[in-house]
Amino acid sequence: MKQRKAKITRKTKETNIVVEINLDNILLPSVSTTIGFLDHMLELFAVHSGIGFKIKASGDTHIDDHHLVEDAGITIGQALKEAVGDKKGIVRYGHFLLPMDETLSYVALDLAGRFYLSYEADIKFQKNGFNYDLIQEFFYALASNAGITLHIKMIKGRNNHHIAESIFKAFGRALRQAVSYSKSKKTVPSTKGIL
């Protein structure tokens, strides 16, 4: 069976990003975005998704982190879409409820090729450090470019870092379920016959 993998490059006046994904070959993640907090979240995603994942990214972070975070989401989404391919034999759906200390987050997704994002996370504004509002921008960009229906809900939580960590880990775990093979590796999981 052909390996499900992709390599996508995105180069604009604002960012330069290369993403490699291999759904069938688990490698140690290689993450370098010049944004320490984003690196940490993407490493968590990669480890918990169980996929081969590499990203090298740079951009105009002297302005702020928005362009790089959003473009990383775009590029990862495009790579996921290409790697998943025709979706024959995949489970298609995934969901995970993940605790992280005082935080509890739930992620559910569908790889049907239709974009939708529901994002409910009560993350408090923080004057210094990472702009946590960019997490929603990241997942919007990723889901819209991958064609994923994605529901993210923080059920409870107090610490911004823990909330973000639980969301990225839960997303990785839900994606792991969705891209795994079902017992019938030859059919597309839809009554339409295609996704």
Swiss-Prot record:
Q: Which GO terms describe its biological process?
A: L-histidine biosynthetic process
Gene giving rise to this polypeptide: hisB
Q: What are the record's GO terms for cellular component? A: cytoplasm
Q: Which family does it belong to?
A: Belongs to the imidazoleglycerol-phosphate dehydratase family.
State the source organism's domain of life: Bacteria
HAMAP family for this protein: HisB
Q: Which GO terms describe its molecular function?
A: imidazoleglycerol-phosphate dehydratase activity
Q: What is this protein called?
A: Imidazoleglycerol-phosphate dehydratase
Q: Where in the cell is it found?
A: Cytoplasm
Q: What is the lineage of its organism?
A: Bacteria, Pseudomonadati, Elusimicrobiota, Endomicrobiia, Endomicrobiales
Identify the EC number(s): 4.2.1.19
Keywords, sorted A to Z = Amino-acid biosynthesis, Cytoplasm, Histidine biosynthesis, Lyase
Q: Which PROSITE patterns match?
A: IGP_DEHYDRATASE_1, IGP_DEHYDRATASE_2
Query: Which Pfam families does the protein's record reference?
Result: IGPD
Q: Reaction catalysed by this chain?
A: D-erythro-1-(imidazol-4-yl)glycerol 3-phosphate = 3-(imidazol-4-yl)-2-oxopropyl phosphate + H2O
Q: In which pathway does it act?
A: Amino-acid biosynthesis; L-histidine biosynthesis; L-histidine from 5-phospho-alpha-D-ribose 1-diphosphate: step 6/9
**Family matches, as CDD domains:** IGPD
Principal location: cytoplasm
Q: Is Ribosomal protein one of the keywords UniProt gives this record?
A: no
